[in-house]
């Protein structure tokens, strides 16, 4: 159903793998450098990169699992794992950023001695690595529509800012002896991390809550279906995302009771084509006549009724 879903998946996977290898390798160097130079800005950036490499690894596993076929046990396959991974990733970012802020506050009152030359060298290398990875992601991956790639890309961008922060802090300490610059840089990094973590978590939870996809205009969709020749009205409408870039719709449509099966088929084909252009790739429409017992509201209102009275889904 999902148009060119698998093709995008292949290039996204390659981008994630290259990024994962580069970021993990550099993260180890930066963590060792942070301990040796005693720089919280470097350590916070390494912590951020650790969450990066974990998120990239989880994203890779998510892509691998998403390729598994649907089964009787899981009729959607493992496509949702990607969204679950994005939630874990977002929460990890939030926790890491809060810990960095806590550490930085302690350091403001007792700034330790920082080996600035080492700090400067490592953060410049870090910036170069981040720029390269961000470039690979932008050119090879789907940073706009795929939540997992977007999450990983946001990590890399805020990492880049983290490296810039560490470079500035090192320069300030070298030239002005401002030892508070190190914890200050880490707080700025932490706030950026917190922000991207919040957004990734919020968007992922919206998908898990079966929320309407952000790029779908519900009023326009209702209008499109109801304006189709042969459709009298619709009700019990649901629009949701199965995973990034795979939107689904189900509804009941009231049609003339004289309609033949082949006529209703051609109405369905027309609606599927129209909705496909509007970003909905998985469409299920139940055709029924006005005589069929139903609730007239467009959106499903069945929260409080007895399951036995429930209109058929």
Swiss-Prot record:
One Gene Ontology molecular-function label: zinc ion transmembrane transporter activity
Alphabetical list of InterPro entries matching this protein: Cation_efflux (IPR002524), Cation_efflux_CTD (IPR027470), Cation_efflux_CTD_sf (IPR036837), Cation_efflux_TMD_sf (IPR027469), CDF/SLC30A (IPR050681)
Superkingdom in the source lineage: Bacteria
GO CC terms in record: plasma membrane
Chain ranges on the Cytoplasmic side, renumbered to this chain: 36-45, 102-117, 181-313
Alphabetical list of PANTHER family matching this protein: CATION EFFLUX PROTEIN/ ZINC TRANSPORTER (PTHR11562), RE54080P-RELATED (PTHR11562:SF17)
Record's protein name: Cadmium, cobalt and zinc/H(+)-K(+) antiporter
Organism expressing this protein natively: Bacillus velezensis (strain DSM 23117 / BGSC 10A6 / LMG 26770 / FZB42)
Gene: czcD
């Amino acid at each position: 159903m999902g148009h060119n879903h698998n093709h995008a998946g292949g290039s996204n996977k390659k981008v994630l793998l290259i990024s994962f290898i580069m970021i993990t390798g550099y993260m180890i160097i930066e963590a060792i450098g942070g301990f040796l130079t005693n720089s919280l800005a470097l350590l916070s950036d390494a912590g951020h990169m650790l969450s990066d490499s974990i998120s990239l690894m989880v994203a890779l596993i998510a892509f691998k699992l998403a390729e598994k076929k649907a089964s009787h046990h899981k009729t959607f396959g493992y496509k949702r794992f990607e969204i679950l991974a994005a939630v874990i990733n977002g929460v990890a970012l939030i926790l890491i950023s809060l810990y960095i802020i806590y550490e930085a506050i302690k350091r403001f009152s007792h700034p330790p001695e920082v080996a600035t030359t080492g700090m400067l060298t490592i953060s410049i290398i870090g910036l170069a690595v981040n720029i390269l990875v961000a470039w690979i992601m932008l050119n090879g991956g789907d940073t706009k529509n795929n939540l997992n790639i977007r999450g990983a890309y946001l990590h890399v961008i805020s990492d880049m800012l983290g490296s810039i922060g560490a470079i500035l802090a090192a320069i300030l300490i070298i030239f002005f002896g401002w030892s508070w610059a190190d914890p200050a840089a880490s707080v700025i990094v932490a706030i950026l991390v917190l922000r991207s973590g919040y957004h990734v978590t919020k968007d992922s939870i919206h998908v898990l809550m079966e929320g309407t996809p952000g790029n779908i205009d519900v009023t326009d969709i209702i209008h499109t279906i109801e304006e189709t020749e042969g459709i009298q009205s619709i009700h019990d409408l649901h629009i949701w995302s199965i995973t990034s870039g795979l939107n689904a719709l189900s509804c009941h449509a009231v049609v003339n009771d004289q309609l033949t099966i082949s006529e209703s088929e051609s109405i369905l084909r027309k609606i599927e084509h129209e909705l496909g252009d509007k970003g909905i790739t998985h469409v299920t429409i139940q055709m029924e006549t006005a005589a069929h017992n139903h609730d007239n509201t467009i959106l499903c209102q069945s929260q409080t009724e007895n399951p036995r009275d429930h209109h058929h889904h």
